[in-house]
């Protein structure tokens, strides 16, 4: 299987399956001298891990990270950083009914045709459990970006199924199981999700991700545009079916006089570009929206076929998220961080000595 490595300078290679002994990643290209402990990484893993509320999968995993290499006396050495997360709560017997049948909406059918074999236990490597390794790597990237530039990356859920969530303040995001920036709607969301779960069905979600204090100049102007690589990173997350940068699809109904972000000596007057122009960061907040499809694993019987092409009816057993989007925020933050750190290091390699005389107006209002 190819395609398990992300990045050009700050590279992350993930490994492991949902019901294997464990999963993890190898980070190469991390600058030396970054203070790093397992606690720095564990914070984000705890935000992503399963079993944290009745609205997510009840699989119980501690997701305790182990740093195996690349850190000495509390600091990165510049050598590969190996991170390991052991699986402890696999229940593979729940998947016996899909050993020779394909679950609708899953990668079972495509994996079988591509590789001629598949690990059906919990979806194997196609499971969203793989994203724990990305979150671990992203935590390292986030810490370096914060120390180097003061970059802060925040993600929150803006819609669950038909329920739109009003923004009240980022301080609410960590106070509820929905990663919602609104505490007043939590009871409504809990009632809604209880109904979804009891109906043996699932729903999708929409998330907003922002990166503040990003330096001007990250990204390349043609194929490696910053917005293109952000979209690539987000689309690589399980269940993501759409990505918007800045105004996104709302740009269709805007006039050029509205959409183009005007500049003044005091700063930009708007941010419809989402912090990126010509594939290069402007220094404004980078703003991204992603759409998450409904969880494919549901207990409602559905039609499919087995490996011989015979019709079957499948009701997925096991422990699954009725809305996988509720645990996507730390994953999306991690992927944005991995894009930004890689481009920051690429920019430093080529353009470290470049200095423009024009003031950085993105900093004028900070």
From Swiss-Prot:
Pathway: Metabolic intermediate biosynthesis; chorismate biosynthesis; chorismate from D-erythrose 4-phosphate and phosphoenolpyruvate: step 7/7. Its EC number is 4.2.3.5. InterPro entries: Chorismate_synth, Chorismate_synth_AroC_sf, Chorismate_synthase_CS. FMN binds at residues 125-127, 238-239, 278, 293-297, 319. Reduced FMN (FMNH(2)). PROSITE patterns: CHORISMATE_SYNTHASE_1, CHORISMATE_SYNTHASE_2. This reaction introduces a second double bond into the aromatic ring system. Homotetramer. This is Chorismate synthase. It comes from Neisseria gonorrhoeae (strain ATCC 700825 / FA 1090). The gene is aroC.
